[in-house]
């Protein structure tokens, strides 16, 4: 994975083959069989979509544990999940837990993943000055059977019209949650409009490297650090 010292990934979306893990750019097994997670294609014999969240959580926690030993050295962990993207495949321990069908179960498993990562930070005493961001790249997909979820009291896109893959706000407005005890007051809310492209400038602002970047770098990225700190929009 370009730009990362180490990585544990799948080559594409979970519904796109080849179905194998890549650890530091090398497959953990060869794709010798055919499996179908929406699209039939070459797969590792041991690879199962239902296990991905468990495996990504394990690798993330091992990374946090290892980095914690290098005291005083900052680290960056990017953990893009296969949930709640299609295929909707909650692990067996979560099936039937939500009462909202497979999608609700998948969301519960997603919550579990986040909780496990937070536990790893806690046991390594890294909570206070570690920024944790939880967000998404688009709104809920119609594959989740949104009308059925709404009837049961769950609005995956809140009150916004639309969903993933259309032009309406339900497809574009997403959660953006931050935990950073040393800097961000718990329970605060900002009305500032931001975009995931703003993460580049914001993180650069936090680590203080703004003067080292070329003038033409990240021209579409704007720091929202003032909003995180409870200050007025500084743009």
Listing of model-derived features with the role each one plays in the protein:
Residues 1-2, 87-90, 96-102, 106, ...:
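Histidine-centered active-site microenvironments of extracellular/periplasmic hydrolases
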Residues 1-73, 81-92:
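Formylglycine-dependent
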Residues 5-14, 140-146, 150-167, 183-188, ...:
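C-terminal cap/loop subdomain of S1 sulfatases and analogous C-terminal strand-loop tails that border
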Residues 10, 63-70, 97, 113, ...:
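Structured segments of extracytoplasmic/periplasmic soluble domains
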Residues 13-16, 27-28, 82-86, 112, ...:
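Solvent-exposed loop/turn segments at secondary-structure junctions
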Residues 46-57, 100-103, 107-110, 153, ...:
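Solvent-exposed, acidic/flexible segments
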Residues 51-68, 92-130:
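A long, amphipathic alpha-helix that forms part
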Residues 74-80, 107-110, 114, 131-136, ...:
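Beta-strand elements within well-structured catalytic alpha/beta cores of enzymes
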């Amino acid at each position: 994975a370009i730009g990362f010292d180490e990585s544990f990934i799948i080559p594409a979306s979970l519904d796109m083959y080849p179905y194998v893990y890549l650890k530091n750019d090398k497959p953990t097994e060869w794709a010798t069989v055919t499996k179908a997670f929406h699209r039939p294609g070459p797969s590792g014999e041991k690879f199962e979509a239902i296990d991905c969240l468990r495996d990504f959580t394990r690798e993330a926690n091992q990374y946090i544990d290892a980095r914690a030993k290098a005291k005083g050295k900052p680290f960056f962990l990017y953990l893009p999940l296969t949930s709640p993207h299609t295929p909707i495949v909650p692990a067996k321990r979560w099936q039937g837990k939500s009462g909202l069908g497979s999608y609700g179960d998948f969301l519960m498993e997603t919550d579990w993943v986040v909780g496990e990562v937070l536990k790893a930070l806690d046991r390594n005493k890294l909570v206070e000055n570690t920024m944790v961001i939880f967000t998404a790249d688009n709104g809920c997909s119609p594959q989740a059977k949104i009308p059925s979820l709404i009837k049961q009291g769950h609005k995956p896109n809140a009150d916004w019209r639309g969903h993933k893959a259309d032009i309406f706000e339900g497809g574009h407005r997403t959660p953006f949650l931050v935990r950073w005890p040393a800097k961000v007051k718990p329970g605060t809310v900002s009305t500032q409009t931001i975009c995931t492209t703003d993460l580049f400038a914001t993180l650069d602002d936090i680590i203080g490297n703004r003067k080292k970047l070329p003038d033409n770098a990240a021209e579409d990225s704007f720091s929202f650090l003032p909003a995180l700190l409870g200050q007025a929009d500084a743009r």
